[in-house]
Amino acid sequence: MSLTPRQLGEQLRQRKQRRQPIAVLTAWDALSASWAEAAGVDLVLVGDSLAMVALGHATTLPVTLEAMVQHTAAVERGLRHTPIVSDLPFLSYQCGPDQAVAAAGRFLKETGCAGVKLEGGEPETIAVIDRLVRSGIPVMGHLGLTPQSVHQLGYRRQATDPVAQERLWQRALELQQTGCFALVLEHVPAELATRLSAELSVPVIGIGAGEGCDGQVRVSADLLGLTPQQPPFSPALLDGRELFSQALRQWVQGVQSAPVPPANHSAPHC
């Protein structure tokens, strides 16, 4: 990558200061990475959503650290200059700072990514982020709807009452103070996200959090209409499933309807 981890954080902060919206797309392999870069994104996120998009799981929970490292390396090979941030998957950092440093270190050493993303803002997570940052590993935070907590919180909208909003606000401030270079806010009220974006000095990247954030992130497969179920806050821009299926169906039907060539037209045996 052309940007070092430190340069990535500085570049994103400069875009925030200049009020230049930040565009982030996910990728899960070299091909999807090349699509994102051709579109001109500022940052590629290798999200643990690849568990659902590429590996067929119902949630993000089953994806392993090994799989995330492998897919992140593939994404890196599909890019020329766009920086990468990768998700630390479920149970790769929840056991404590030592585990988190070992896991995050693999991404920086083996994949060329510029940082990692962690979900949550509980005291235990803050301690993990503090250790990562002090170890020289850039961290992007993630609050609101956190898919790794699906069994506790579900996929419903988060921070919808004053108590929950105050808790999210304080956690966002803690993440910034601990050293996160950016923050993802997912599926929270737009007014709250707008106020937080104005309050924080680090960029706030929204998904389902309104248009008042410093940038937006989307799962590429959702935008392309490739996933069977669309999140309500991430509508598709085209019906990719139907377009791809139609093209493949046309080829299959052409093969199946073609006349079988006579035996003497087959290639000679060597």
Curated annotation (Swiss-Prot):
Residues at the active site: E186 (proton acceptor)
| Example GO BP | pantothenate biosynthetic process
Keyword Ribosomal protein assigned? no
Coiled-coil segments on the chain, per record:
none
* InterPro entries named among the record's database cross-references: Pantoate_hydroxy_MeTrfase, Pyrv/PenolPyrv_kinase-like_dom, Pyrv_kinase-like_dom_sf
Which EC class does it fall in?
transferase
A Pfam family hit: Pantoate_transf
UniProt key word Calcium: no
User: What cofactor does this protein call for?
Assistant: Mg(2+)
**Quaternary structure (record):** Homodecamer; pentamer of dimers.
Protein name stated in the entry: 3-methyl-2-oxobutanoate hydroxymethyltransferase
